[in-house]
Amino acid sequence: MEPIKNLPRLCRTLGYEFKNIELLTQALTHRSAANKHNERLEFLGDSILSIVISDALYHQFPKATEGDLSRMRATLVRGDTLTIIAQEFKLGDYLYLGPGELKSGGFRRESILADAVEAIIGAVYLDSDLEVCRALLLKWYAERLAEIQPGISQKDAKTLLQEHLQGFKKPLPDYQVINIEGDAHDQTFTVECRIEDLSQSVIGVASSRRKAEQIAAAQVLELLKK
């Protein structure tokens, strides 16, 4: 297996440096590419993600009902959310895929991207411990946990846009940061969103990349309604 050329960049994006880099390599390996693939790590990561998010929601919402907690957890750990996280990390650029999956665009396939996120979580856990993994996940989910509320619709603009495109079997939206201004503690992000059905790109500007992406996605949804 060839080494992944941009692995240090991916580690910086993830916010975690692996002691055993082979664990990350395995987490990025689809079963179509090698016998030592990421499915067992995915199984582990799925369980860890569930307990970390469950614990965070339990303490964040002391008055929420079991039903509300379950719905919020489902929103945060479902495949659509994991796919969006994978896109934010640009995981498709790092995946090991077999020739067939590569040719068919597996690096964009939602299930493969979501599974890779769970596998990376499992890899981080094996490389460190549960508390290190918890701290990393809470960092990944900080904005989503800050925004989510019990008893209301949990779907944000990026999720709604993704579901709309999936319904028509269209490619996922492409988000690119085209400009960052300001000091590290007071930055403004400009993000461009492109989809197959629109000839022009749509721009979102906000104080974080994710917020800018949400603004751009909301504008695309409005254009699609016209």
Swiss-Prot record:
Keywords recorded for this protein, A-Z: Cytoplasm, Endonuclease, Hydrolase, Magnesium, Metal-binding, mRNA processing, Nuclease, RNA-binding, rRNA processing, rRNA-binding, tRNA processing
Cell compartment(s), UniProt: Cytoplasm
Alphabetized Pfam families for the sequence: dsrm (PF00035), Ribonucleas_3_3 (PF14622)
The organism's place on the tree of life at top rank: Bacteria
Residues in DRBM domain copies: 156-226
One Gene Ontology term from the biological process aspect of the record: mRNA processing
Entry GO MF terms: double-stranded RNA binding; metal ion binding; ribonuclease III activity; rRNA binding
Reactions the enzyme catalyzes: Endonucleolytic cleavage to 5'-phosphomonoester
Classification via PROSITE patterns: DS_RBD, RNASE_3_1, RNASE_3_2
Family: Belongs to the ribonuclease III family.
Protein name (database record): Ribonuclease 3
Organism: Shewanella baltica (strain OS185)
